[in-house]
UniProtKB/Swiss-Prot annotation:
Annotated membrane topology: Multi-pass membrane protein
Induction: The promoter contains putative CRE1 binding motifs 5'-SYGGRG-3' and expression is differentially regulated in light and darkness by CRE1. Photoreceptors BLR1 and BLR2 negatively regulate the expression, while ENV1 exerts positive regulation.
Protein name: Major facilitator-type transporter sor6
Cellular-component GO terms for this entry: plasma membrane
Species assigned in the record: Hypocrea jecorina (strain QM6a) (Trichoderma reesei)
Gene3D superfamilies: MFS general substrate transporter like domains (1.20.1250.20)
Family: Belongs to the major facilitator superfamily. Sugar transporter (TC 2.A.1.1) family.
Lineage: Eukaryota, Fungi, Dikarya, Ascomycota, Pezizomycotina
Localisation: Membrane
Gene Ontology molecular function: transmembrane transporter activity
List of glycosylated residues: N29, N36
Keyword presence, ATP-binding: no
The protein's role, per its UniProt record: Major facilitator-type transporter; part of the gene cluster that mediates the biosynthesis of sorbicillinoids, a diverse group of yellow secondary metabolites that restrict growth of competing pathogenic fungi but not of bacteria.
Encoding gene, per UniProt annotation: sor6
Swiss-Prot/TrEMBL keywords: Glycoprotein, Membrane, Transmembrane, Transmembrane helix, Transport
Length: 534
């Protein structure tokens, strides 16, 4: 073995070390872990994870799990950071390419539009874990994940993002810049889908709360921190190096992931184990997934995965309203990328660097919201009797967040008069950041608990919907703020969140009844009862 291979085998299971280790485990399992079947073509051995199986990612050590979680979460943060860091380079790019503010902000919109395409394409290829719940891996729905897993999309997407972002840094004109940012955003959709699935691979549902909470904050903290860092970077090193900085950030995370993050997707690991066992003793082994899914054509599987999210979105009222609520919030976050430069750079004469600091209030609110969400999960939800936990048990933080959202937005809108100190409006934007976290996280968990076996499709639909809104909102921000004024322009999305505010209250009180009347929610509940032997 080479020196490099020796070093790799001592690390936290890099990609190169996975296969040999799995073969060794597989060979041991031939004698120590009997499988159902006879080992013939007609009656093959059925390979599934054994109790305390070290090849099962859920049985890996806590340090290793959290190390991998931090890598995939930083990947999401890097992508969303890149989406917004561009937004504070307006003056320099508009001057260099002689373009309007609307055409400039299109560079943000197309990047986020790529996120919308991401779940639609990457989701069927790398389903965000299973749609049959961890309660029974044998019930996994067939997707093309068994062909690609999570590792190959990670390598492909990060490589492509680095290439397109590097190209954008050298763009000779605005058309090239916009096209390359769109392509970078499309490949950036892969980490948004794949990272959450990797966390679900590592942690069983009862232990997943904290990891998913931190992961779910990354898509909102990234867009807020992007302008803060990008503003000063633009001022001192120019907009091209802002794109270059983002390229390096994504590239470093991608390389770290290639080195340290092994394949975590259960069906792929079981298939590899079955192949290794077959080679080891010449008998026939297949994974439990192969046994249960039958011989389905990839085209059939891919088509179903593309259609199901839209069926759930438009046929399930819970999914539609929850997705609309989250989309309005997400769109508003990206609206502020165009609004803040108008409010502080244009009207108060701030430089790009100091203009980016206007996002500090929202950032503080997001961090406080994250702390509150962790406290609520550990101090309230986890102390509930497991037999009495319902999907609605997730919603109390969303009630607080639903109130905080319009308060923060109206306060920000009407404290931006020149006669009022700038610090007031920035401080009062914190409730908006607080509300973003406390509405999004509980609603995501509510949808997962309500739709269990269909959770991946539900979340894919919600992700596409909110990304479209995130792409559209910035396009009319400049006209809206210049025509209506900064006070009323900010009040419009505030009124939208006010209209949506009753949703968490209503679902907390009547959600169980509504779920019984929704076809797929009721079906998911029945499937879970059968899987759990109830």
């Amino acid at each position: 073995m080479s020196k490099e291979a020796s070093q790799d085998s001592r690390s936290i299971t890099p990609v190169e070390a996975v296969e040999p280790l799995e073969v060794v485990d597989a060979e041991k399992n031939v004698t120590t872990s009997p499988y159902n079947g006879s080992g013939t073509v007609e009656d093959p051995f059925i390979v599934e994870f054994q109790q305390d199986d070290k090849s099962n990612p859920m049985n890996w050590g806590q340090f290793r799990k959290w190390f991998l979680t931090s890598i995939v979460t930083f990947s999401v943060f890097a992508v969303t950071f890149t989406s917004s860091a561009y937004s504070v380079s307006a003056e320099e790019i508009m001057t260099e390419f002689d373009i309007s503010s609307t055409l400039f902000i299109t560079g943000v919109s197309v990047f986020v539009l790529g996120f919308a395409i991401g779940p639609a394409v990457w989701g069927p290829l790398v389903t965000p874990h299973d749609e049959r719940s961890n309660a029974n891996r044998a019930s996994l729905q067939s997707t093309r994940s068994e062909l690609y897993g999570r590792q190959m999309p990670w390598i492909a997407s990060h490589t492509a993002m680095v290439a397109f972002m590097a190209g954008s840094a050298g763009s000779p004109n605005i058309a090239t810049l916009i096209v390359l940012r769109f392509l970078a955003g499309t490949f950036g959709g892969s980490p948004l889908v794949n990272s959450g699935g990797a966390i679900a691979d590592l942690f069983p549902p009862a232990q997943r709360g904290l990891a998913m909470t931190i992961y779910c904050v990354a898509p909102f903290l990234g867009p807020i921190l992007g302008p803060i860092v990008g503003g000063f970077a633009t001022e001192y090193i120019g907009w091209r190096w802002v794109q270059g900085m983002c390229t390096i950030f994504i590239g470093v995370i991608g390389i770290i992931g290639v080195i340290f993050v092994p394949e975590t997707y259960g069906p792929v690991l079981l298939q590899r184990k079955a192949n290794a066992l077959s080679k080891a003793d010449g008998k026939v082994y297949i994974s439990v997934l192969q046994k249960n899914q039958g011989k389905k054509q990839p085209s059939e599987v891919f088509g179903r995965a593309l259609i199901r999210p839209w069926v759930l979105l438009f046929r399930e009222p819970i999914v539609l309203i929850a997705s609309l609520y989250m989309a309005i919030i997400y769109g508003t976050v990206y609206m502020f990328l165009g609004a803040m430069p108008i409010v502080y750079n244009e009207l108060r004469g701030w430089s790009p660097g100091f203009g980016g600091l206007a996002f500090l209030g929202m950032m503080v609110g997001i961090i406080i919201g994250l702390g509150y969400a962790i406290w609520d999960n550990n101090g309230r939800y986890m102390k509930l009797d497991p037999s009495k936990r319902t999907a609605e048990s997730r919603l109390p933080p969303a009630i607080a967040g639903a109130v905080a959202l319009p308060i923060g937005m109206f306060a920000f809108a009407w404290t931006n008069y020149p006669s009022i100190h700038w610090a007031v409006s920035i401080v009062l934007s914190a409730p908006f950041g607080f509300g973003v976290v406390l509405v999004i996280l509980p609603i995501v968990n509510y949808l997962i608990d309500s739709y269990t076996v269909y959770a991946a499709s539900v979340l894919a639909a919600a992700a596409v919907f909110r990304s479209i809104m995130g792409a559209v909102f910035p396009l009319f921000t400049s006209q809206m703020y210049h025509n209506l004024g900064i006070h009323w322009a900010t009040s419009i999305p505030a009124f939208l969140t006010l209209v949506c505010m009753p949703f968490p209250f209503f679902m907390y009180r009547y959600g169980a009844v509504v779920r019984e009347k929704c076809k797929y929610a009721a079906e998911a509940a029945q499937i879970m009862k059968k899987m759990q032997g109830r």
